[in-house]
């Protein structure tokens, strides 16, 4: 009887350990992208391959979050009846102006939400998933379940080329 009780206790602890470990691995917290002089935020409208180069057609936006988002929101929408932004972020895009940016072949690309399996029930936030440029192009074109063109992206541009692309998570 003591062996059975011990076995049940050990099994229970093992199950709790695995659940806690699995939760900890997938429970990375959101961290805002640091604003730098070489980073802009934009919607990506198109990705094309031209003359051996990958080009993004983008529309730059102003991205705000936290207290800064609340401040800009209240300045721009004083009659909203709200005390701040509903979701903690605010996007300003006063004029849509598309322009092209070349992507460096070795650009670092980081995604938060995209279709990995073709099943809507599998779509979930998976923080900071690195993908290759080829994978990113495939993700962008595969818009049946998750249309990533509807997400802002933080683009780091150095020497005229995009060297880093980070998908902005939207709650």
What are the language-model segments listed below?
Residues 1-25:
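Sec-dependent N-terminal signal peptides of Gram-positive bacterial secreted proteins and lipoproteins
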